[in-house]
UniProtKB/Swiss-Prot annotation:
HAMAP family: PrpB (MF_01939). It comes from Salmonella typhimurium (strain LT2 / SGSC1412 / ATCC 700720). It catalyses: (2S,3R)-3-hydroxybutane-1,2,3-tricarboxylate = pyruvate + succinate. The gene is prpB. Changing residue 122 to K: 2-fold decrease in the catalytic efficiency. Retains the same oligomeric state of the wild-type. Pathway: Organic acid metabolism; propanoate degradation. The lineage of its organism: Bacteria, Pseudomonadati, Pseudomonadota, Gammaproteobacteria, Enterobacterales. This is 2-methylisocitrate lyase.
């Protein structure tokens, strides 16, 4: 296996930065913006695919193909290692999970997380979640680990058990998931910093903290997370939320005032856009090709 596989790049980033900040990229353009800002890893949110690409809620409606489309668009242009939200594995059988792992890895992702919610899943920070048995989730993880062909591809287990069964049961699940082969752990909707320390002590694998806005988890700083032995800080939809609010403002002002003059200051300039997508390099290449064609 190549030493430069996406999975190895993700693990290398994790080794260099503590905690590793992983930002959500709703599309390929945002992936490039994250790269320019200096991030070492990016994330594709299942809720982001549903809301951003499909205009639908995060209730298990998106398909594997929906996710693969967005993965390919990102990995085609951005070299940063990509962590992907694989929900419950896009199907109820081990074969579904295996197909999901193989497909996501083939599309160029570095890592995925798979969760222990039931098929009719909900956003991890909403009420009335339901989870499968510990044994069923262990089977999902085993199927995922068995399906990968690159040992560096990261299989991360997410558990939503805290809100459903309590901390001790969630810790018990965490240990079982690691024993089943999970490389890293994503305890969802954590409410206290000390809980992360418990997961880190029990699991003895890298722990991810989902620092999403307007949810159950406080907006802990990287210093606070580091003190709690958190290895990864995830910001799944921060830029997406800001983008949506900016779009709402522009649409409203343009409709009400008949001009965009009063919102120009919040817009990315033409030159800034071109620089972020390497427009000028493409243009220079095009000019060179036409010069060669004429000569």
């Amino acid at each position: 296996m190549s030493l430069h596989s996406p999975g190895q790049a993700f693990r290398a980033a994790l080794a260099k930065e503590n905690p590793l900040q992983i930002v959500g990229a709703i599309n390929a353009n945002h992936a490039l913006l994250a790269q320019r800002a200096g991030y070492q890893a990016i994330y594709l949110s299942g809720g982001g695919v549903a809301a951003g690409s499909l205009g639908l809620p995060d209730l298990g409606i998106s398909t594997l193909d929906d996710v693969l489309t967005d993965i390919r668009r990102i990995t085609d242009v951005c070299p940063l290692p990509l962590l992907v939200d694989a929900d419950i594995g896009f199907g109820s059988s081990a074969f579904n999970v295996a197909r999901t792992v193989k497909s996501i890895a083939k599309a160029g992702a570095a890592a995925l997380h798979i969760e222990d919610q039931v098929g009719a899943k909900r956003c991890g920070h909403r009420p009335n979640k339901a989870i499968v048995s510990k044994e069923e989730m262990v089977d999902r993880i085993r199927a995922a680990v068995d399906a990968r062909t690159d040992p560096n591809f990261v299989i991360m287990a997410r558990t939503d058990a805290l809100a459903v069964e309590g901390l001790e049961a969630a810790l018990d699940r965490a240990q079982a998931y690691v024993d089943a082969g999970a490389d890293m752990l994503f305890p969802e909707a954590i409410t206290e910093l000390s809980m992360y320390r418990r997961f880190a002590d029990v699991a003895q694998v890298p722990i991810l903290a989902n620092i999403t806005e307007f949810g159950a988890t406080p907006l802990f700083t990287t210093d606070e997370l580091r003190s709690a032995h958190v290895a990864m800080a995830l910001y799944p939809l921060s830029a997406f939320r800001a983008m949506n609010r900016a779009a709402e403002k522009v649409y409203t002002v343009l409709r009400q005032e008949g001009t965009q003059k009063n919102v120009i200051d919040i817009m990315q300039t033409r030159n800034e856009l071109y620089e972020s997508i390497n427009y000028y390099q493409f243009e220079e290449k095009l000019d060179a090709l036409y010069r060669n064609k004429k000569s």
